């Protein structure tokens, strides 16, 4: 993943969604090397999955806004029902370029699963999956 000025500009031009819209929206965060994704839904919970791995399901908890900038949504820390896994996630309204998919996404995400930090992109599930790069 690489963050770019072009991706950030797409936010300013209105291609992204504002953080005010994210509190109730389903969203997906994802990254490469290792390939992983987190899907957030108030009905299905917060579901983490690594490519080829099993889903790890956390209870849904509405995000809160960071005190420092107000544009970053914070999820967690949350634990699975068994207490075996813990997740935290920060989603910010900063452009993100997925170089493997050659796509620009409106948000970036940092996920911490059981102490391992994963960085990637994010988008609302009802948004365009990403604008093509020129």
Residue ranges and their predicted role:
Residues 18-134:
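Cysteine-centric segments in proteins
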Residues 8-12:
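Classic N-terminal secretory signal peptides
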Residues 1-7:
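Bacterial N-terminal signal peptides that target proteins for export
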Residues 14-16:
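C-terminal motif of bacterial Sec signal peptides marking the signal peptidase cleavage site
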């Amino acid at each position: 993943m690489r963050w770019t000025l072009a991706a950030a500009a797409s936010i300013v031009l209105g291609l992204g969604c504002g953080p005010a819209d994210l509190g109730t929206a389903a969203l997906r965060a994802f990254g490469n090397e290792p390939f992983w994704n987190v899907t957030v839904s108030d009905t299905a919970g917060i579901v983490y999955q690594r490519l080829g791995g099993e889903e790890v399901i956390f209870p849904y908890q509405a995000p809160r806004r960071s005190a420092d900038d107000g544009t970053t949504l914070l999820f967690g820390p949350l634990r699975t029902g068994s207490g075996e896994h813990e997740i935290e996630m920060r989603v910010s309204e900063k452009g993100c370029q997925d170089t493997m998919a050659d796509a620009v996404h409106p948000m970036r995400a940092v996920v911490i699963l059981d102490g391992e930090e994963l960085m990637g992109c994010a988008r609302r599930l009802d948004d365009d999956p990403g604008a093509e790069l020129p």
